[in-house]
């Protein structure tokens, strides 16, 4: 390790000990190393003993900086790994850090654009509108049209910091996996690898721009969701230019109510938008926390969601969508047998899973949920309980389902914050039933025919020629098969002849050896010559 890496590692361990995070290790697995480090090397005590462990973990991650804050945010969605009191504290982590110098931001923007800002913009505000761990946002106007826009620029020199911390994370994950057998189930190395991929994706603003363009296209003209327009000609890997929007933050309940917003419709539309993204588009915004969601104030009776920051998105293939919809419908119909069978059929759990045991486990975990009124059941926690139970039966971590679960928890939490009486199931069930009908009913056949019709129309003129070629190739194949079979029969016949000649030759050689000391020397010589001759003939038969 380099001196810089050792210094950073020292700081990380120091912060962990100051916040008493060694308590996260099971007592029977607590080795002498943390105790020795605390007492003899650092002389550090837990300075926050009055705070609950989850609170201490959150404060420690905040002190360690942006890379660790975002790691904690990701871990808050993995409620299969942490108890609720820790996951709830991690969910409170805010990706807000002190802004960096606006002149540095301007320098990097001009570098990305290849020229001075005033070639494209006017009224550039050197003071940032918002600042986060990865990027910072400034406002300006387009020079040609006067349209208000925002410029999002990656923090300067952030990549070396991220690379250094990720390297340390990987080393620490390997140490934890090796030294703590109980931690291997949590797959710390795989968790860090998943986080690294997500974080590095956020460093390329071209990816976020492409996601925003796709999401905007999916909801073009929609009254339910608006996505600000990206200006791709001015965007690059380190700079994204997009339309500026004015809205009310979705968590600002007081302002929304003062504006006369229809809170019930707003909450229900959040659910509709989510399921539309998942099941209609197979492409969903996977970072729908309150900081990324605003409400259009212009028409409060018909409120419209505004989605920002499309850096993290999720996708589902058609099989996953179908199994997910069937799972949810079966669960709310309390058909646990079907839920278990669907998990096996989808490959989410191994095919040799005992379905009876799996059904019983699901029933034991999920049946108590129905003790509550249907409107109070948490859709997100339904998925959480299902996936946690499935993991006991060796369900592999499905990244796309983890993102889906996280997003559903966000949407459900926002919806019930806006309208506590929100019955998410009543809103979602008709959508799921209609979608399933379109997938497996007569309409599904019609849709499939419509989808494939252009392809078959293109291939129709070629069908006679393709049919003729197939028949000709089939005839040639039959002739070739006859030749191969005849060759096989000839080969077997030659092998049989060779074996016979070899046996006769061997017999004659043995007779020659027996007769060599007898009065019949000439007969012995004749047998020997004949035996060698038969051997040569058998060798020739094998060679053919």
From Swiss-Prot:
Active site annotation, chain numbering: 287 (proton acceptor)
UniProt-annotated binding residues for ATP: 129-137, 152
Pathway: Cofactor biosynthesis; ubiquinone biosynthesis [regulation]
Keyword Protein biosynthesis in annotation: no
CDD domains, A to Z: UbiB (cd13972)
Cellular component terms per the entry's GO annotation: plasma membrane
Group of enzyme by EC: transferase
Subcellular location: Cell inner membrane
Keyword Oxidoreductase: no
Transmembrane portions of the chain: 500-520
GO molecular function annotation: ATP binding; protein kinase activity
UniProt keyword annotations, A-Z: ATP-binding, Cell inner membrane, Cell membrane, Kinase, Membrane, Nucleotide-binding, Transferase, Transmembrane, Transmembrane helix, Ubiquinone biosynthesis
GO BP annotations, alphabetical order: regulation of ubiquinone biosynthetic process; ubiquinone biosynthetic process
Pfam families in the record: ABC1 (PF03109)
Every Protein kinase domain range: 123-501
Entry EC no(s): 2.7.-.-
Superkingdom of the source species: Bacteria
NCBIfam families, per database record: PRK04750.1, UbiB
PANTHER family hit by this protein: CHAPERONE-ACTIVITY OF BC1 COMPLEX CABC1 -RELATED (PTHR10566), PROTEIN ACTIVITY OF BC1 COMPLEX KINASE 7, CHLOROPLASTIC (PTHR10566:SF113)
Record function comment: Is probably a protein kinase regulator of UbiI activity which is involved in aerobic coenzyme Q (ubiquinone) biosynthesis.
Family: Belongs to the ABC1 family. UbiB subfamily.
Protein name: Probable protein kinase UbiB
Gene that this polypeptide is encoded by: ubiB
């Amino acid at each position: 390790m380099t001196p810089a890496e050792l210094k950073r590692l020292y700081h990380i361990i120091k912060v962990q000990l100051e916040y008493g995070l060694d308590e996260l290790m099971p007592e029977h697995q607590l080795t002498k190393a943390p105790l020795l480090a605390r007492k003899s090397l650092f002389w550090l005590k837990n300075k926050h003993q009055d705070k609950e462990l989850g609170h201490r973990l959150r404060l420690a991650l905040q002190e360690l900086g942006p890379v660790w804050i975002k790691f904690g945010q990701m871990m808050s969605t993995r409620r299969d790994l942490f108890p609720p009191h820790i996951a709830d504290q991690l969910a409170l982590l805010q990706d807000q850090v002190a802004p960096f110098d606006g002149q540095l931001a301007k320098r990097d923007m001009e570098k990305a654009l290849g020229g001075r800002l005033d070639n494209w913009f006017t009224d550039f505000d050197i003071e940032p509108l918002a600042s986060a761990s990865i990027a910072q946002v400034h406002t300006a106007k387009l020079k040609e049209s006067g349209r208000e826009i925002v410029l999002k620029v990656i923090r300067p020199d952030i990549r070396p910091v991220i690379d250094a911390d990720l390297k340390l994370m990987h080393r620490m994950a390997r140490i934890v996996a090796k030294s703590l057998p109980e931690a291997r189930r949590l797959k710390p190395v795989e968790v860090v690898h998943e986080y690294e991929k997500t974080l590095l994706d956020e460093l390329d603003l071209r990816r976020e721009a492409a996601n925003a363009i796709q999401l905007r296209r999916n909801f073009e003209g929609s009254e339910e969701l608006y996505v600000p327009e990206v200006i791709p000609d001015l965007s690059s890997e380190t700079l994204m230019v997009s339309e500026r929007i004015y809205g009310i933050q979705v968590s600002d309940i007081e302002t929304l109510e003062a504006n006369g917003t229809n809170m019930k419709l707003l909450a229900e539309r959040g659910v509709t938008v989510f399921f539309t993204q998942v099941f209609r588009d197979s492409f969903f915004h996977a970072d729908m926390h309150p900081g990324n969601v605003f409400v259009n104030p212009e028409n409060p009776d018909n409120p419209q969601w505004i989605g920002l920051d499309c850096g993290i998105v999720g996708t589902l293939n058609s099989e996953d969508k179908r199994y997910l919809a069937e799972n949810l419908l079966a669960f709310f119909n309390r058909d646990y047998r079907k839920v278990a069978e669907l998990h096996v059929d989808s490959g989410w759990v191994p095919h040799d899973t005992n379905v009876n045991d799996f059904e019983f486990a699901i029933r034991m975990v999920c049946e108590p949920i129905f003790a509550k009124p249907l409107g109070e059941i948490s859709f997100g926690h339904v998925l959480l309980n299902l996936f946690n139970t499935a993991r006991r039966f060796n369900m592999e971590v499905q990244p796309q389902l983890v993102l889906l679960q996280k997003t559903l928890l966000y949407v459900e939490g926002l919806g019930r914050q806006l309208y506590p009486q929100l019955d998410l199931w009543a809103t979602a069930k008709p959508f799921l039933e209609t979608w399933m009908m379109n997938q497996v009913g007569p309409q599904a056949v019609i849709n499939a025919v419509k989808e494939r019709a252009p392809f078959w129309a293109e291939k129709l003129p070629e069908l006679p020629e393709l049919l003729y070629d197939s028949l000709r190739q089939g005839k040639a194949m039959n002739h070739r098969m006859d030749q191969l079979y005849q060759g096989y029969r000839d080969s077997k016949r030659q092998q049989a002849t060779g074996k016979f000649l070899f046996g006769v030759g061997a017999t004659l050689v043995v007779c020659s050896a027996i007769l060599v000391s007898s009065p019949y020397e000439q007969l012995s010589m004749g047998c020997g010559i004949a035996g060698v001759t038969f051997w040569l003939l058998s060798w020739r038969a094998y060679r053919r």
